[in-house]
Amino acid sequence: MNLTTMGQAAKAAAFDLAVAPTAQKNKALAIIADELEANKDAILAANEKDIKAAVEAGISEAMQDRLLLTEERLVGIANDVRNVINLNDPVGSEIDSKVLENGMSLSRRRVPIGVIGVIYEARPNVTIDIASLCLKTGNASILRGGKETFFSNMELVKVIQVALEKAGLPAASVQYIEKPDRELVSQLLTMDDYVDMIIPRGGAGLHKMCKENSSIPVIIGGFGISHAFVDESADLERALVVVDNSKAQRPSACNALDTLLVHEAVAPQFLALLANNMAGRVELVAEPKAYGLLKEFEGVSLREAQEGDFDTEWLSYTLGVKVVADVNEAAAHMQKHNASHSDTILTNNIESAEKFINTAGSAAVYVNASTRFTDGAQFGLGAEVAVSTQKLHARGPMGLEELTSYKWVGKADYLIRS
């Protein structure tokens, strides 16, 4: 496999995509959706190979479920592509404009970024999500999925490329790195002549490697410790429902709750509710004050927090628990422990809510709502290519607009600078 050749082909395809009309891009998306359903037998057969390999490798059942494609899930993925068709195409839209004193009409117009390299985890639906969003925004993409979904991804990319050609667009608009070789990832990160942006979707190790080795701008997405703070004024029964949803609805999601902070004034009452609610379902990892309150309850899976626990993105049925003095201590804890993804305060006090909003450094901050809402579809953005936890270019769920840049357009009547 020659990555340089892939890069050259992607750059050439990006020029064609940048001027492709919305109707043509939507036609390609419609064909992709239809081809996914028409080729379901081949796709599911490829997925069976991945699942068999996962079982033989001893991969957890939770991870196997993330790898699994079913006919129902495939229909859902096809419909997600159709939903992208219905989203407004941001390319070519005017962000703002003004007329200068010299008579020039000056505006900013949205344009594609160019070629986007995406390195992502073992979820085959991500292949379709990324390809669809990049296509809609006129970006070419080079994808590198996890080895656990190799066969599934190869079949999915084949379907995408057939659809692109049927729509009159270059097949190289979406390419896939076939070998799960880390050396190829390292090479991709240095291909700044061809690739304009890198998006890693995975754990802290992948993000660190990309930041340290890439000569291409990197969007850091997904990783971050998510917190909930239960304030002394909170409605405890309703707060418990939000905490449960944040933690247990889908614990493997990047927006699932990792650490629960509880105001000391309500800690005895709330932790009693928490213990009964989480018993038999969630392991609680508690600092001394919280541990002392929780150990009184039977049936609770409980251990004392060790160094590094509050810096851990659990992605499982595990929850860190800490008692704090007030919203200020909660904010200080969050600043120390990588609160960059999604954080929520449960409170009936407006001042506490505003202080939390202003001090939280996360990409998404909530008042009396679950952390699980940090998602492109939930935000009304359609699908997402990633959830950015950095501060430059894009922040939070990255939908269509976040996959564009802009150019300045000046129009005048043969104007010269004096």
Swiss-Prot record:
GO process terms (BP): L-proline biosynthetic process
Q: What class of enzyme is it?
A: oxidoreductase
Keyword vocabulary terms for this entry: Amino-acid biosynthesis, Cytoplasm, NADP, Oxidoreductase, Proline biosynthesis
Q: Which reaction does it catalyse?
A: L-glutamate 5-semialdehyde + phosphate + NADP(+) = L-glutamyl 5-phosphate + NADPH + H(+)
Q: Name one GO cellular component term.
A: cytoplasm
Q: Per its record, what are the GO molecular function terms? A: glutamate-5-semialdehyde dehydrogenase activity; NADP binding
EC number(s) stated in the UniProt entry for this protein: 1.2.1.41
Biochemical pathway: Amino-acid biosynthesis; L-proline biosynthesis; L-glutamate 5-semialdehyde from L-glutamate: step 2/2
Q: Where in the cell is it found?
A: Cytoplasm
Q: Which NCBIfam families match?
A: PRK00197.1 (NF001221), proA (TIGR00407)
Q: Main role?
A: Catalyzes the NADPH-dependent reduction of L-glutamate 5-phosphate into L-glutamate 5-semialdehyde and phosphate. The product spontaneously undergoes cyclization to form 1-pyrroline-5-carboxylate.
Family recorded in the similarity comment: Belongs to the gamma-glutamyl phosphate reductase family.
HAMAP family, alphabetized: ProA
Q: What is this protein called?
A: Gamma-glutamyl phosphate reductase
Q: Which gene encodes it?
A: proA
